[in-house]
UniProtKB/Swiss-Prot annotation:
Gene (UniProt): tatD
Organism: Serratia proteamaculans (strain 568)
Protein name: 3'-5' ssDNA/RNA exonuclease TatD
Disulfide bond sites: none
Complex formation: Monomer.
Location of the protein in the cell: Cytoplasm
GO CC terms, sorted: cytoplasm
Organism taxonomic ancestry: Bacteria, Pseudomonadati, Pseudomonadota, Gammaproteobacteria, Enterobacterales
Keyword field: Cytoplasm, Exonuclease, Hydrolase, Magnesium, Metal-binding, Nuclease
Family: Belongs to the metallo-dependent hydrolases superfamily. TatD-type hydrolase family. TatD subfamily.
Length: 260
């Protein structure tokens, strides 16, 4: 089972990153994709991936929260990072109109530029969309025939938005959000609609600790070692065998990100 979304560069992991990786291995996780969210974090993610060869890969990109930092210099350096052997996708990029830490105009410019970069480099894209689906889809659609693959990470949208993502040919990343009895029930009901070959699972650690973990962890910090719990829960809600699903999401991740 492959975790396609781990924020391993987070300061929350500063004291025990090697142990976090080893706990994931011990839990049966077969690989991690470390998320890059700005130039500095993308560089750090790449370096971590190189330290854990054959288990970790990374993305390189600028999250919509940081879109105001996007300029020609950043674009050039993201392009250079993308050439590193363990960088598997451009991103995390997209739109987030929930908080607008960068203006919508800045977000759209950075998103479009990163889609163009991914198309130029023939790399998959690791996508973010929150409260912005119409513009997200409109900006993304013209690029899809030029991109090898795309996954919308941490999907928490509506039935209509899921249908739109699937019609665009996107793969869908599901996190422990779906384990939340307060806000994950709508998403849980949508799980059977996602084709098995388009489903990816992720922890988004250290965020989104599954609320139904038993016994409850003493810390609220999420870790990739909890991915097997998400796999078991999603398998139950999709009425699939958890071992089969774990293998399937590993195959999906390795195919989508073209991992050796």
């Amino acid at each position: 089972m492959f975790d396609i979304g781990v924020n391993l560069t987070s300061s929350q992991f500063a004291k025990d990153r090697p142990a976090v990786v080893e706990r994931a291995r011990a839990a049966g996780v077969t690989g991690l994709l470390i998320t890059g969210t700005d130039l500095q974090e993308s560089r750090a993610a790449s370096e971590l991936a190189q330290q854990h060869a054959n288990f970790c890969w990374s993305t390189a990109g600028v999250h919509p929260h940081h879109a105001s930092s996007w300029d020609e210099r950043v674009a050039e350096q993201i392009c250079e990072l993308a050439a590193r052997p363990r960088v598997a996708a451009i991103g995390e990029c997209g739109l987030d109109f929930n908080r607008n830490f960068s203006t919508p105009e800045q977000q759209e410019a950075a998103f479009s530029a990163q889609l163009a970069l991914a198309a130029e480099l023939s790399m998959p894209v690791f996508l973010h969309c929150r409260d912005a689906h119409a513009r997200f889809a409109a900006l993304l659609a013209p690029w899809l025939d030029k991109l090898p693959a795309a996954v919308v990470h941490c999907f928490t949208g509506t039935a209509e938005e899921l249908e739109s993502c699937l019609s665009l040919g996107l793969s869908v990343g599901i996190t422990g959000w779906v384990c939340d009895e307060r806000r994950g029930l709508e998403l849980r009901a949508l799980l059977p609609q996602i084709p098995a070959d388009r489903l990816l699972l992720e922890t988004d650690a250290p965020y989104l600790l599954p609320r139904d973990l038993l016994p409850k962890p003493t810390s609220r910090r999420n870790e990739p070692c909890f991915l097997p719990h998400i796999v078991r829960q999603v398998a139950a809600w999709r009425q699939e065998d958890p071992e089969w699903l774990g293998q399937k999401i590993d195959e999906n991740a390795r195919r989508l990100f073209r991992l050796e």
